[in-house]
Amino acid sequence: MAGGGGGGGGEGPRQLDQTPTWAVSTVCGVIILISIILELIIHKVGEVFERKKKKALFEALEKIKNELMVLGFISLLLTFGQNYIASICVPSRYGHAMSFCGPYDGPSEDDRKKLKKTDHAMRILYSVQRRSLADAPPVNCKKDYVALISLNALHQVHIFIFFLAVFHVIYSAITMMLGRAKIRGWKVWEQEVIHEQEMMNDPSRFRLTHETSFVREHVNSWASNKFFFYVMCFFRQILRSVRKSDYLTMRHGFISVHLAPGMKFDFQKYIKRSLEDDFKVVVGIRPELWAFVMLFLLFDVHGWYVTAVITMIPPLLTLAIGTKLQAIISYMALEIQERHAVIQGMPVVNVSDQHFWFEKPDLVLHMIHFVLFQNAFEITYFFWIWYEFGLRSCFHHHFGLIIIRVCLGVGVQFLCSYITLPLYALVTQMGSTMKRSVFDEQTSKALEQWHKKARKKNEK
């Protein structure tokens, strides 16, 4: 007895023409309302950035909107093309090669009893059954052929795209908040140096270069050995990435090279704007990063453990970048000591690109961009698998290793956002060029007038 028309429990899935109009209208209305609210929130955030003249942050927001639009197009293509994609057949020997999980025989009797204790576990069992039905070969597939991808698998990919969009916004916000929080702590030093500016320029304040706190903190007997030099730089980025003497020395060097002597200048505000300008770069998703996503999914094969190796790239690269940036600061201190000069006030550092890898400061920023993207992608991937397949799925055979990977991801996010990116924003100012784009209008006009006066003096 199949339960014909009486109770609705035995009814199969209804098509749209059999669905009540109020149900369709309600669902559409809720989705439209949520979409409008999200659009208004993004619009209001953009208005705040424009009102506060945060040009770099506004451009970063526009870039995030563009990335979300790309993800939206991907979602639309999946929706409209899912029936056509699911109808593609491939030979069985290819259809069962390089799978995410090994042969799945279903849970044992003991496991089944444990899983039934929670609703979440019941959902896992249901998803297993649903996958087995959805993965059945379609009618139009010939013998020894299987579907390229099932409708249910396409739906799961669709959910993955949604996770990418949500976590991309969340990670971008976290990165910016942590970076700004770090630089905000330097405001006290900036206010102190502004109040003491007259004293700093006092001609009576003469010292030997090796007596300055900046040189003393970076130059010691261990600095002559390359190995111990980089070991010190490695630990310095973790224990105390930027000291007061570092900030004041680089501030003095920047102003001495790029600005007029005695000019009032808020260096901390400039660094904050520079960070926002860098954020505009790291928030985007370049084509090569999409290529990395494809390679990550391609090599996430059961038993290969390639993704476990890839997971180690962000922490290692982050520590290498931080060590290099600390080494640049220490090299500048060594250069000051080698002059054996008597200085007035703060020591002046040499401003040059030669300390950076291949003399390209932007290369470091692109490496930070890659680290942040890969780390965010792996965390997103973990939560998507947890949502779709459960925490103890075949994707997580070695659960202890998964926990370590997640902890590493959280650590890298904090280290890169709170330490490495602000440190880069500071150290990159010691390059040969300065970012005119991050100055506000008033400062830019003052700089232009000063450069014109300097040019006229040189002509005379």
UniProtKB/Swiss-Prot annotation:
Single GO term (MF): calmodulin binding
Cell compartments where the protein resides: Membrane
Protein name as it appears in the record: MLO-like protein 9
Region (Calmodulin-binding) location: 441-460
Chief place of localization: membrane
Gene that encodes it: MLO9
Chain ranges passing through the membrane: 22-42, 68-88, 159-179, 290-310, 316-336, 367-387, 399-419
Residue ranges annotated as Extracellular topological domain: 1-21, 89-158, 311-315, 388-398
Family that this chain belongs to: Belongs to the MLO family.
The keyword Lipoprotein is annotated on this UniProt entry: no
